[in-house]
């Protein structure tokens, strides 16, 4: 991963929690193409549940809540917006916070929900619906579609009683089972040495709470990246969620497995580096593990609640540079190695193992990808 992210501005608004960030990007597909592009792996569609429907508080409804990243350039006068359609209803449009962005940066925004869509536009529809991310420019007289997709809406009853006036209090959510078989391997910069000593990261999805995760990396059958000092492990690898797609209202787990929540987990290995070109001698804890000096197949095994739950295998070529060609050919918008993820055990509950074939990236499935058996 050669992108260098540095936050330059952030804006947080209430209710829809509109988060906007302008960051640097060293290499961008948009720069090569001369126009803005959407990073497909950044698009996250959720359902915002309204506590009314057509003026009645006896029935809940929903509207889309989306966040995504745009690789620049975004020209002066450019305005991002989303248009969505549910069967039997006219299209609805809502604007997203937008800022002029040069080609070497990207812009991230979250929009929709209560702040972007009037409550009277709420719907009780469930099933697939279409949406598009667009950019209009009143100054240039242009209107361009940047991304089109489909998301599947489902519902589950709220954690209230299920009778009387509460009978139609359903909470809506987007099904993200398609994410589970798809993982990513990439590097991030070292805080001090930058790309001279990049850190290994592996990302994957779980259905449920991304807590109590313990990652272990293996090479030729032996665990690597563990450094002990005076009987204590230092620089221990860790996992945490960086994306959580969940409901906006409380639901009971007995009604919705894992409470209809999907979390993207990033496991970072501080002791494992793509290479070390810093020229520094090893410190007091010893040398860091270098992938470029140990090419071949690696396997990440992850314990979740003390049970083996994930296996991710990937190859590192000589020199340590990851093969991001699959991401490039599918115009993912982010330079990452895409890898299959093996789901082990039953902690994710029952999930659709074939969803990735048609639903991945909201109806834009990967070409050239095969899920793990």
Segments predicted by a language model, with ranges:
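Intrinsic disorder/low-complexity segments in short proteins, especially the signal peptide
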Residues: 6, 16-18, 27
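Contiguous segments within soluble domain cores/interaction surfaces
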Residues: 32-145, 172-302, 310-312, 318, ...
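Signal peptide processing junction and immediate N-terminal pro/mature segment
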Residues: 22-32
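Bacterial N-terminal signal peptides
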Residues: 11-21
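Extracellular interdomain linker/stem segments of modular secreted and single-pass surface proteins
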Residues: 152-159, 317-323
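Disulfide-bonded cysteine-rich modules in secreted/extracellular proteins
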Residues: 156-171
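Bacterial N-terminal signal peptides that target proteins for export
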Residues: 2-12
